[in-house]
Amino acid sequence: MNTMKRMDCRDLNQSELTQHCAELGLPKFRGRQVFQWVQQKAVQNWEELKNIGAGDRQKLQDGLFLQPLRKVREQISQDGTRKFLFRCADGETLECVLMDYDRRKNRDRHTVCVSTQIGCAVGCAFCATGLGGWRRNLSPGEILGQVLDITYLMRQEDPDFQVTNIVFMGMGEPLLNYEAVLKAIELLNDPEGQGIGMRRMTISTSGVAPKIRQLAKDNPQVGLAVSLHSAHNTTRDQLIPMNRKYPLEELMEACRDYTTLTNRRITFEIALISGQATLEAAQAVGHLLKRQLAHVNLIPVNPVAGTGMARPTAKEVQQFAQCLESMGIPVSVREEKGTDIDAACGQLRRQLECEQK
């Protein structure tokens, strides 16, 4: 009697798949074949593995899950941004976003913003995800599955479609699901899978200081973005409750350690909120970052029902940016994508939950 635990094949790297295939009584080379079908070609069921016989496919089906995320809803913005609401095997829903950017160096840039948790425990004041609380962590297969299933859907329209960049900026705090996120990155980077370069992937964190240091040691090639939002602990406590555990002094020390170990610049994200995007706030950010290898990305906040926060004026955004530039801080204003479809994380999922109540 076979008592071996049935595993999600999307969770497994080539070595693990090879071992699992051997345990199923299959030739070891099947592991590489299965990995390529699942991770590179983003197949949705075992019948699509055309170079594997029916008998071996049945063994794979008996010993491994191949269960794609199910698309529940899709919204398409006027700028081409697509927002997907997917349902997991246990019925939970998650969001991810596909953003297309201008052609550069003769190649299209297709960026997927992925979620790492169902809900979020951090509870940032301007984020829709945290309004419903934290449910659970996503598995490596569920994290990278967002990329695979978007790839599969888009290849119905363009057979040559390929995701080029990943940002871990969707639902959840990536560094609170650390092991699963790093495993997903490993799988996405594999040249026989999606083959996405480490430097084309960026993790965004609310400021989990110990994990920032650990990331510098475990994977120094992946980009890091820190949700800063304020240079004052009192304000940041209100915007990002994580600050009460890891206040600015501890966070910035971890960031300095990160740049010392990796020699890589950190992107500091600042959500600009009407009434708070002041010159005084900009000057405080400039002073905080003056000795840090940093780039500031300004994000005019998306209005979210239930937060009471409004967007700043274009003049407020411009003055904030100019102030930082005058202090020698590199700064950019995020190119907005999908504003007409509520593309910020958590909004589509929250909309569905409100409809079902």
Swiss-Prot record:
It comes from Desulfitobacterium hafniense (strain Y51). Specifically methylates position 2 of adenine 2503 in 23S rRNA and position 2 of adenine 37 in tRNAs. Belongs to the radical SAM superfamily. RlmN family. GO terms for biological process: rRNA base methylation; tRNA methylation. [4Fe-4S] cluster binds at C120, C124, C127. Reaction proceeds by a ping-pong mechanism involving intermediate methylation of a conserved cysteine residue. This is Probable dual-specificity RNA methyltransferase RlmN. Keywords: 4Fe-4S, Cytoplasm, Disulfide bond, Iron, Iron-sulfur, Metal-binding, Methyltransferase, rRNA processing, S-adenosyl-L-methionine, Transferase, tRNA processing. Disulfide bonds join C113-C345. The active site is at E95 (proton acceptor), C345 (s-methylcysteine intermediate).
